[in-house]
């Protein structure tokens, strides 16, 4: 159960009459609270209030600790199945040599082959900040020459202060 939601068990239930459901799904019908508690204790289980707003409130006879354990297991299993997206960043300067571009693109392609997202950033220095189009043009040129057809452009080149950034993701097969 979630931590924010308060759960009423056994004697904590204040309703005079309850619609009871057994652990196996069997419906006991509408019972007085004392009778429902008696049935739960006889079977060695807990009486758990499931729907307090219903008329009459719905309670289930079950092993509460076992139920909580199963809920935790489901949450852990769901967490395991989540895929963490790793983003690698490669920085360029606006006046980068072609040889250096080739070297950095080689690494970017390796990251994409490993199913990682790659953020390409052009760092603008000094007077280059006045003309961020240089960075946009460089990223577009890199995209056209190296990645088009091999990857997906998640974000177009955008200007973020001193940087011009573009996000490239592996192509979905």
From Swiss-Prot:
Gene3D superfamilies: Translation initiation factor 3 (IF-3), C-terminal domain, Translation initiation factor 3 (IF-3), N-terminal domain. GO terms for molecular function: ribosome binding; translation initiation factor activity. GO terms for cellular component: cytosol; membrane. GO terms for biological process: ribosome disassembly. InterPro entries: T_IF-3_C_sf, T_IF-3_N_sf, Translation_initiation_fac_3, Translation_initiation_fac_3_C, Translation_initiation_fac_3_N. Keywords: Cytoplasm, Initiation factor, Protein biosynthesis. It is found in: Cytoplasm. NCBIfam families: infC. Monomer. HAMAP family: IF_3. Belongs to the IF-3 family. IF-3 binds to the 30S ribosomal subunit and shifts the equilibrium between 70S ribosomes and their 50S and 30S subunits in favor of the free subunits, thus enhancing the availability of 30S subunits on which protein synthesis initiation begins. This is Translation initiation factor IF-3.
